[in-house]
A protein has these predicted regions:
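Canonical RRM/RBD RNA-binding surface and closely related RRM-like beta-sheet modules
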Residues: 2-51, 55-68, 72-75
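Low-complexity RS/RG/RGG-rich segments used by eukaryotic RNA-binding proteins and nuclear co-regulators
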Residues: 71-100
């Protein structure tokens, strides 16, 4: 496997009841690379939800990993990941905040 660290994923809004392990297991099933870290941040305006940042070392030998990265390179695009039919998460490329 060839791992390449490039793009972080963001799930902007997830119920607080969904565990980090559930998110981890869902992304492991996609077989897109090594899940390096999952960061949970509570949403400021709604304490029942959180934002998820997923750091991945991408396995670029997998077609799905390459397709996801290609789709998300344009930061306006998103993907839907179904975690429990019909429920899904909208996945975006993470845009790190800049300190000004």
């Amino acid at each position: 496997m060839t791992y390449k660290k490039q793009l972080e994923l963001c799930i902007p809004r997830v119920s607080e009841k969904i565990s980090r392990k559930f998110i981890f297991d869902t992304f492991v099933k996609l077989n897109i690379g090594y899940i390096d870290r999952i960061i949970e941040t509570p949403l400021r305006n709604d304490s029942h939800y959180k934002r998820i940042i997923i750091r991945i070392k991408w396995d670029n030998t997998q077609n799905l990993a390459n397709e996801i990265q290609k789709q998300l390179e344009d930061l306006k695009n998103h993907l839907n990941v179904v975690y429990d039919m019909p429920w899904f998460w909208q996945i975006y490329a993470n845009q790190p905040q800049r300190n000004i």
